[in-house]
Amino acid sequence: MSDLRIAIVGFGKIARDQHVPAIAATPGASLVAVASRNASLPGVPHFRTMAEMLRDGPAIDAVALCMPPQVRRTEAAAALAAGKHVMLEKPPGASVSEIAPLVAAADKAGVTLFATWHSRYAPAVEPARQLLASRRIEQVTITWKEDVRVWHPGQDWIFEAGGFGVFDPGINALSILTRVLPQPLFVTKADLHFPYNRAAPIAADLDISDMDGLPIRAEFDFRQTGPQSWDIRFDTTEGPVTLSLGGAKLFDGDTLVVDAKDAEYQGLYRRFVDLTSRARSDVDLAPQLLVADAFTLGQRHVVDAFEHKAEVKA
């Protein structure tokens, strides 16, 4: 069987750092084009827009859409209408309701729509799910704090309406949470902290639960400097189970159970190749529904202005 010929649309940091090496490392996948207004990749055909690429570019089977979520829906719809398989970076769209028409369009065209959650493919996530299946969980604490200036340098879109703000990384934690816990979850309380010069939150504190009343506390913050925190602690009757470093490590109490190399995006592309071989879609909106809950229920708090270039004090 020939390789799945993939084009990347939107060639920013995540595409360059994660998608390109993952495609290169995935059997049955090859990168044949890039569409981006501002960036290119040596040795790969480049086009300024996806429309130009579809019209004048090489034969492609699929597109990986890596542009900001605010503009993803229209590009996804155009690619599906052209009969191309579509991979959506997370979050799949700027809103929840805009995804259903894309699912219908993929079904009608007989192609794959894959809404990706890369953190679910972290090496410790599935072992954690299996371990927790035999435990009674009493409470969950999520601490997901990072420095936006390091991970999204100069990317103003992330603080625009529809850019998700701190929920751009925070949704990674929610994607893990909704994978490892067996019951549907919902937000019961949210405090959202908006810089007074921005349209999306820079920090958020959430209370989440399930129908059995499991208490889950999530703290997201884009202002953390120094060591970064991507941890989920499950307190069980048999002791704590902790996912750390975004799901790279798993601790059962003090015992390190999993400590593996990151291969999240390779996992995504293996899944994409498999889905496209069967023209099947994979669209789970549970993580984004929790974000929508947070914006619906959230109390807004105004905090200091944010600029990507930190103020230098004399």
Feature-to-residue mapping (PLM):
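Contiguous beta-strand/loop segments that form the cofactor/metal-binding neighborhood of enzyme cores
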Residues: 174-247, 270-280, 296-299, 312-314
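Predominantly a Rossmann-like dinucleotide-binding segment in NAD(P)-dependent oxidoreductases
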Residues: 119-188
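N-terminal Rossmann-like dinucleotide-binding module
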Residues: 1-43, 271
